[in-house]
């Protein structure tokens, strides 16, 4: 593609050199640059791409997009100066890959909890309807039934647009995507055209990056502020920030709720460990999911599918066939009648939701034993809160390691224990080895009890000192049970 065609997507401050050159590819990683490519220098949280301009030129880059043109420009290289390289990168990438989001309906899901479940269930629902569908999520990316491994909730703009381009080439008609607060703040979704957006809820998370809940809220809200006029914004009225999210959007606003009058109204009629009986807009349906939070997730899926043009009755039929997402309230039964639940709950609110769901089914007929940790090099403020919430709603608590990353596991555990009082401590153990912690919970459990293993869910690794070691909560439980 000619450089001057690419530049139509942005408003450069200035261009020095030839803008009619052929660009063979676009890159933000100097190590991956090939001959004839455009290298785009971004200022990241860890490094500044401007420092790698010489390396990119050495690798064969013929054009450089940057905020500051080097003091000694290299002859024969075209320099494009922009005010905001973060914003420009997404727009350039989407243009280079043929504006893929104009070729299908793209729906983004944002919020603290429920993103993966809602995006994945929408993907499964529209595959049930017979469409070719794409999914971009924390667990895995899919182009129809072909899995593509994932590193972040939302990939960098180049990877993201390349993936969306593949989805368009493969004939996907719908794409469902988790949209993280990081990706909104870092403009990774700049240039994408959304057909709709869904807001789930907002509770404490990622404060290691956003610093304050207000900044975190602003990042989420920006997604809806930028939503186009002909798109829909579907927001959760049961969250106090539900209407805040959509107050400045140009899109059409719709609401869903389990508590209030809304466009999509739901309620739980019955709940047990095999599933729930629900009422959505005065239609009854039986589903294989547990917990109010899952009823809310399914209601969002129902609403979005209807807003994408499907009949309510057809959507309800599709929902009744769906299975829970990997690592999300994943139940395993032991031969002696103990139920273990593996769940990704890694925020205080998610933990409360899962524990409430367990108590809603148990109705006081069994003990709850919770195994929980907290991630290293992440928001330390939530650690004592996680432990306190676990203690409040459990008969026994075992504080253990999650992904310690570059921190000492015992120090993370100590941060968590600081949230407990003397009464809580009587029912709490701390075991740094996660496998031993799970084994201990299994030894303590009797027939009719429930063990919650929280925090890692679908993850099949434990990250220690920069190395990912194989570790799967579900595998460990099955091994102990059998």
UniProtKB/Swiss-Prot annotation:
Its EC number is 6.3.2.13. Keywords: ATP-binding, Cell cycle, Cell division, Cell shape, Cell wall biogenesis/degradation, Cytoplasm, Ligase, Magnesium, Nucleotide-binding, Peptidoglycan synthesis. GO terms for molecular function: ATP binding; magnesium ion binding; UDP-N-acetylmuramoylalanyl-D-glutamate-2,6-diaminopimelate ligase activity. Carboxylation is probably crucial for Mg(2+) binding and, consequently, for the gamma-phosphate positioning of ATP. UDP-N-acetyl-alpha-D-muramoyl-L-alanyl-D-glutamate binds at residues 30, 153-154, 180, 186, 188. GO terms for biological process: cell division; cell wall organization; peptidoglycan biosynthetic process; regulation of cell shape. It is found in: Cytoplasm. Pathway: Cell wall biogenesis; peptidoglycan biosynthesis. A motif (Meso-diaminopimelate recognition motif) lies at residues 402-405. Its cofactor is Mg(2+). Its main location: cytoplasm. It catalyses: UDP-N-acetyl-alpha-D-muramoyl-L-alanyl-D-glutamate + meso-2,6-diaminopimelate + ATP = UDP-N-acetyl-alpha-D-muramoyl-L-alanyl-gamma-D-glutamyl-meso-2,6-diaminopimelate + ADP + phosphate + H(+). The modification N6-carboxylysine is found at residue 220. GO terms for cellular component: cytoplasm. Meso-2,6-diaminopimelate binds at residues 378, 402-405, 455, 459. The keyword Transferase does not apply. ATP binds at residues 111-117. HAMAP family: MurE. Belongs to the MurCDEF family. MurE subfamily. Catalyzes the addition of meso-diaminopimelic acid to the nucleotide precursor UDP-N-acetylmuramoyl-L-alanyl-D-glutamate (UMAG) in the biosynthesis of bacterial cell-wall peptidoglycan. This is UDP-N-acetylmuramoyl-L-alanyl-D-glutamate--2,6-diaminopimelate ligase. The lineage of its organism: Bacteria, Pseudomonadati, Bacteroidota, Bacteroidia, Bacteroidales.
């Amino acid at each position: 593609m000619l450089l001057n065609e690419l530049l139509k997507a942005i408003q450069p401050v200035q261009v020095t050199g030839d803008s009619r050159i052929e660009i063979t590819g676009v890159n933000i990683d100097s190590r991956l640059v090939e001959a004839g490519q455009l290298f785009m220098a971004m200022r990241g949280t860890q490094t500044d791409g401007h420092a790698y301009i010489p390396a990119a030129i050495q690798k064969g880059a013929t054009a450089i997009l940057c905020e500051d043109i080097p003091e000694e420009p290299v002859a024969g290289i075209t320099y494009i100066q922009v005010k905001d390289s973060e914003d420009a990168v997404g727009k350039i990438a989407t243009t280079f890959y043929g504006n893929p989001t104009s070729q299908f309906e793209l729906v983004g899901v944002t919020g603290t909890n429920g993103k993966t479940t809602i995006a994945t269930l929408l993907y499964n629902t529209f595959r049930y309807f017979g469409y070719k569908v794409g999914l971009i999520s924390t667990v895995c990316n899919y182009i129809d039934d072909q899995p593509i491994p994932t590193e972040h909730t939302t990939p960098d703009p180049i990877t993201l647009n390349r993936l969306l381009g593949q989805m368009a080439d493969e004939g996907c008609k719908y794409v469902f995507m988790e949209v993280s607060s990081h990706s909104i703040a870092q403009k990774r979704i700049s240039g994408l055209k959304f057909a709709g957006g869904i807001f789930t809820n907002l509770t404490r998370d990622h404060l290691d990056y956003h610093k304050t809940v207000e900044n975190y809220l602003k990042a989420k809200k920006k997604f809806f502020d930028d939503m186009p006029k002909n798109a829909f914004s579907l927001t959760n009225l049961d969250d106090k920030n539900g209407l805040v999210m959509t107050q400045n959007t140009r899109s059409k606003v719709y609401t869903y709720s389990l508590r209030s009058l809304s466009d999509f109204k739901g309620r739980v009629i019955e709940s047990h460990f095999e599933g729930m009986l629900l009422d959505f807009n005065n239609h009854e349906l039986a589903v294989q999911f547990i917990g109010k939070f899952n009823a809310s997730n399914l209601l969002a899926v129902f609403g979005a599918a209807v807003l994408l043009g499907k009949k309510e009755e057809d959507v309800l039929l599709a929902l009744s066939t769906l299975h829970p997402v990997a690592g999300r309230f994943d139940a395993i039964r032991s031969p002696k009648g103990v139920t273990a639940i593996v769940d990704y709950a890694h925020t205080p609110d998610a933990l409360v939701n899962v524990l409430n769901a367990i108590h809603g089914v148990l109705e006081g007929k069994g003990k709850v034993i919770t195994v929980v940790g907290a991630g290293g090099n992440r928001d330390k403020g939530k650690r004592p809160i996680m432990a306190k919430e676990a203690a409040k709603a459990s008969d026994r608590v075992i504080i253990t390691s999650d992904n310690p990353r570059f921190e000492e596991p015992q120090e993370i555990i100590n941060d968590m224990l600081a949230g407990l009082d003397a009464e809580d401590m009587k029912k709490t153990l701390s075991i740094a080895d996660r496998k031993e912690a799970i084994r201990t919970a299994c030894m303590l459990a009797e027939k009719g009890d429930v063990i919650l293993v929280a925090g890692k869910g679908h993850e099949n690794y434990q990250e220690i000192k920069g190395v990912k070691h194989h570790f799967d909560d579900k595998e460990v439980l099955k091994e102990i049970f059998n």
